Amino acid sequence: MEQLASLLLHSRTQAHSFHVGVKGVGALSAHQALQHYYDTIGGIVDGLVEAYQGQYGLIKLQPVSGLDTNNDIKNIIAYFDKLLVAVAKLREDKKLQMSWLQNDIDNIVTLLYQTKYKLVNLQ
């Protein structure tokens, strides 16, 4: 959970960084999609972490690498693809198998795919 929570909380900041720097063809739709992502992800992750901590105790967030400053749409889409792969792997943790935790993770995956859809198709 520590790695998953850290990655997702960092993704909010990364999406905000992409949001303020995106330009070119498709920038307006990307700008809006990224804003929706960073406005939404924090609340979902907060609920997931609080539920987990209610069951297992407090977690310690892990270090995450710095911000990606490449604001090209293709790079932003690749970033979300990497997040989807990471979440798919990290959600397999034995302590995350309770249905209420998996439901929150499902909501995170839904948000990731919605954001990717908007980045790819609404240019």
List where the protein language model places each region.
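Short amphipathic alpha-helical segments with heptad-repeat character
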Residues: 2-5, 9, 35, 42, ...
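Long, well-ordered alpha-helical segments
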Residues: 4-22, 48-51, 83-90, 112-122
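Acidic side chains
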Residues: 16, 46, 104-106
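Acidic/histidine-rich alpha-helical segments that form the ligand environment
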Residues: 64-119
